[in-house]
Structures are given as structure tokens and as C-alpha cells.
Amino acid sequence: MSNPILLGIFWHFIGAASAACFYAPFKQVKNWSWETMWSLGGFFSWIILPWCISWWLLPDFWRYYGSFDMATLLPIFLFGAMWGIGNINYGLTMRYLSMSMGIGIAIGVTLIIGTLMTPVLQGKFSVLFGSAGGRMTLLGVLVAVIGVAIVSYAGLLKERVLGIRAEEFNLKKGLILAVMCGIFSAGMSFAMDAAKPMHAAAQAQGINALYVALPSYVVIMGGGAVVNLGFCFMRLATCKGISLKADLAQAKPLLIANALFAILGGVMWYLQFFFYAWGHANIPADYTYISWMLHMSFYVLCGGIVGLLFKEWKSVGQKPVRTLVLGCMVIILAANVVGLGMAA
């Protein structure tokens, strides 16, 4: 396996680790509605950071974005909005299914669709089955799905031991939402593929290959921001139990602490895709669709590791922990299989 491929896998792991940890600062926010907290963190992760980093990277910020027509920008923006819908559905999925079942189905669906639909839509179906490397990467995707399923089953065992149930368990609604979440969340993978002209234009301006995807985040995450912020503002305006005015009426020290934690959560959330761009830049051109599989499977892997480090599995017995470790090992195996496939 070549050094660039190893680096690509490594950076995808770092990005996924940030994704697995980003909600920890949000948990420290007190006496705020989820909508206010999510909006503030999201404002930094979807708008402030993408714009600031692009402003810093691009020699001529406005000329760069002005060089693209609507036929190029609109699909990228809409795929970003599609991914934003997936974010909202993710929370609803957890509401109607258990955490483990919701994550297992949603991540499994988005991993498969986001990984395989890109080469199919590009007309590169032969790449998947027509070469030894393509077949091996497909095997790696299958192994990753199995690993995600095992980790999800470990979560189910944990929930049974701890007596955790979904807030409003509804199998039919939960399954529909989980599948929808998986489909819509794959919008990020599609957006990255649609943004290739933006990546090429950034590289033509002399930007390092590791950073060429970052300017496209202004458009991609702009689409996600419209959906997420619109959803949050609508709820703040219409739901009786929550109020922006009440959230901002807290004592000044608490307001400052809440704001800092929300912003930190937003920064950590953005870092997952910052390093996703680094990983993506090191993946061979014929296998860029594998970036999504690496990110999502490592997200589940890192989530399991974080849970163990924070002793969330301390009192659940040996079987759930052993199952979790097995699932994590299978995901690591999947990453190695995919890496060998790309190097073939």
C-alpha cells in the first residue's frame, strides 16, 4: 500500500474522530434549547469557518466564485441541502428507534448509497467489477457494512442491559426515517463529486492539493446551513416550549460558557470535513468514491472507541464490550481491504 493511500486513510480517520467527539462540548451547554445551541454551533461550522478559510486560501476570493455559472453551483448547493435534510432526519431517527438501531440503519444506508452511487452515476460501473482493485474495494465496502452492523448490535446489547428505550419507539416511522436519513446524508458524497470543477479551479490558482476541496464547502455547507438553520428558526418561532428570548435571558457567565461550548462543538464538527478534504486528496482518482465509505465507517469505529474511553460501557458486562471490539476490528479490516484494493 503506497504512502499517499495510507495518508488518505489516516486523514479520514482523524476527520471521523473529530466527528465522533464534536457533540461532547454541546453536552456542556445548560438551559438552552437544542435549536439555539445547534444554530450557533452550525453558524460557525457551516458559514463562518468555510468562508474564512476560503478567504485565506484563495488569491482572489470573489473572482474565484464568480467564475462559476449557476449550472455548476446549483447542483452542489442542492446536494448540500440534501445532506442538511439528512442531518435533521438523523435526530428524528434516534427519537423513534433505539440509538443503536438508528445508527446502524442510517449509517449503513448512507455508507452504501454514498459510496456506490457516485461511480454508477458517473458511468464508471466497470471500475467496480471490471478490475481486481475495484472488486477488492467492493469487498471492503461489504466488510465495512458488516462491521457497522456488529457495532450497532453491540449498542443494542448495551441498551438492553441498561434498560434504555427510544423516546417514542415506532418501528415503522423509525425505519422510514432511518432509510431517508441514509439516502439524504449521502448528499455530501454527491456534492463533493459535483464540486470537482471547483477543486480543479482552486488547484489552477496554485492552492495545495490538500486544500483544493475546502473552497467548495462555502457552497456545499451553505446548502446544509439553509436547511438546518431554517428548521431551527422555524421551531424557535412556532414551538411554545422553546424561545430564543428565554435562552438569551440566562445569566451572563452561563451565556458566555454556553456560547463558547456551542462554538467549540461547531469547530470540531467542521474539522471532520477539513480532514475529509485532506484524506480525499490522497485517494487515487479512480477510487475517490471510497472516501465516503472510509469516513462513515471510521465514524462508527471512533464512536465506539470514544464510548469506551468515556466509560460508557463500564457496567454493561463482557458480551456487549466484546461485540463492540469485534465490530471495531472488522471496520479496521475493511479499511485495510479497501486500501489494498486502491493500491492494486
From Swiss-Prot:
<keyword id="KW-0812">Transmembrane</keyword>
<feature type="transmembrane region" description="Helical">
    <location>
        <begin position="38"/>
        <end position="58"/>
    </location>
</feature>
<dbReference type="Pfam" id="PF06379">
    <property type="entry name" value="RhaT"/>
</dbReference>
<keyword id="KW-0762">Sugar transport</keyword>
<dbReference type="GO" id="GO:0005886">
    <property type="term" value="C:plasma membrane"/>
</dbReference>
<feature type="transmembrane region" description="Helical">
    <location>
        <begin position="324"/>
        <end position="344"/>
    </location>
</feature>
<keyword id="KW-1133">Transmembrane helix</keyword>
<feature type="transmembrane region" description="Helical">
    <location>
        <begin position="4"/>
        <end position="24"/>
    </location>
</feature>
<feature type="transmembrane region" description="Helical">
    <location>
        <begin position="68"/>
        <end position="88"/>
    </location>
</feature>
<feature type="transmembrane region" description="Helical">
    <location>
        <begin position="175"/>
        <end position="195"/>
    </location>
</feature>
<dbReference type="GO" id="GO:0015153">
    <property type="term" value="F:rhamnose transmembrane transporter activity"/>
</dbReference>
<keyword id="KW-0813">Transport</keyword>
<feature type="transmembrane region" description="Helical">
    <location>
        <begin position="207"/>
        <end position="227"/>
    </location>
</feature>
<dbReference type="GO" id="GO:0015293">
    <property type="term" value="F:symporter activity"/>
</dbReference>
<comment type="similarity">
    <text>Belongs to the L-rhamnose transporter (TC 2.A.7.6) family.</text>
</comment>
<keyword id="KW-0997">Cell inner membrane</keyword>
<feature type="transmembrane region" description="Helical">
    <location>
        <begin position="255"/>
        <end position="275"/>
    </location>
</feature>
<keyword id="KW-1003">Cell membrane</keyword>
<protein>
    <recommendedName>
        <fullName>L-rhamnose-proton symporter</fullName>
    </recommendedName>
</protein>
<dbReference type="InterPro" id="IPR004673">
    <property type="entry name" value="L-rhamnose-proton_sym_RhaT"/>
</dbReference>
<feature type="transmembrane region" description="Helical">
    <location>
        <begin position="137"/>
        <end position="157"/>
    </location>
</feature>
<feature type="transmembrane region" description="Helical">
    <location>
        <begin position="101"/>
        <end position="121"/>
    </location>
</feature>
<comment type="function">
    <text>Uptake of L-rhamnose across the cytoplasmic membrane with the concomitant transport of protons into the cell (symport system).</text>
</comment>
<feature type="transmembrane region" description="Helical">
    <location>
        <begin position="290"/>
        <end position="310"/>
    </location>
</feature>
<keyword id="KW-0769">Symport</keyword>
<keyword id="KW-0472">Membrane</keyword>
